[in-house]
A protein has these predicted regions:
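Phosphate/nucleotide-binding beta-alpha loop and adjacent structural elements of enzyme active sites
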Residues: 1-234
Length: 234
């Protein structure tokens, strides 16, 4: 008899495919799409899904646009998400994947790529977008916004409380990389308070002294487990 603990927790997309065994995955929100790094992975794993990709940085969005043109069923948007709608400063780095609505923290780890630039960018709330787009079910919500994950979740209160989001994949920072960043404790309390189960950490990155810098976390709504039998251990 195979041990499931030996196969879960290794590949976050493979695990998502195993958790979401009910309705076919048809809607993926890629928040913090940057230059489109996740597009091909999502498309290969979930071929029937429409991917909605969001990127507020003008320069990164132009690269995202080119990447999306090569992938079917992708819709792109030149704005990001926060706890309120409006124009806000986006802190810009030489490496666009480090851009954040937050300023750099005391343990910001890229001295050669400081967040020393700013650009005005548009932000919306996730609740507004879902209402505007008429989306009633989100299979995968991916959030990678460099420390601002809690701002996105605060703007998604209605979506989280109404159980229209089946799973959430998001990045969590453990060092003080960004000023006012969401913590594991805050994110855990927020999502478990809305009925989500924490299922694992993936793609962990450590600094030279062994401290965990950041990783991806996966939360699945408890409703996805409603018809599954309780585990039986020897």
């Amino acid at each position: 008899m195979s041990d499931p603990s030996e196969s879960f927790g290794l590949d976050i997309l493979a695990d998502l495919r195993r958790y979401l065994v009910g309705p076919t995955v048809r809607t993926i929100l890629d928040i913090g799409a940057n230059e489109g790094q996740s597009l091909l992975q999502f498309r290969e794993t979930f071929p029937e899904a429409v991917i909605h990709s969001f990127e507020p940085s003008p320069e990164a969005f132009e690269i995202l646009k080119k990447a999306a043109a090569k992938v079917p069923d992708v819709q792109i948007y030149d704005y990001g998400f926060a706890d309120r709608s409006g124009v806000q400063d986006l802190h810009i780095s030489l490496h666009s994947c480090l851009n954040s609505i937050l300023s750099s923290g005391k343990e910001y780890a890229w001295p050669s790529a400081p967040l020393d630039g700013r650009v005005s960018a548009r932000f919306q709330t996730l609740d507004w977008f879902l209402s505007e787009a008429g989306i009633e079910l989100v299979d995968i919500l991916k959030i990678d916004v460099q420390g601002a994950e809690m701002l996105v979740l605060k703007g998604a209160r209605n979506a989280l409380s109404s159980r229209i989001v089946r799973s959430i994949k998001l990045e969590i920072c453990f060092l003080s990389l960004y000023e006012g960043q969401g913590t594991l404790d805050q994110i855990y309390k927020c999502l478990t308070g809305h009925g989500y189960l924490f299922t694992g950490l993936y793609d962990r990155f450590y600094e030279d002294h062994g401290r965990l810098c950041w990783c991806d976390a996966l939360f699945i709504h408890a409703g996805e487990f409603a018809d599954k039998k309780s585990p039986q251990f020897p």
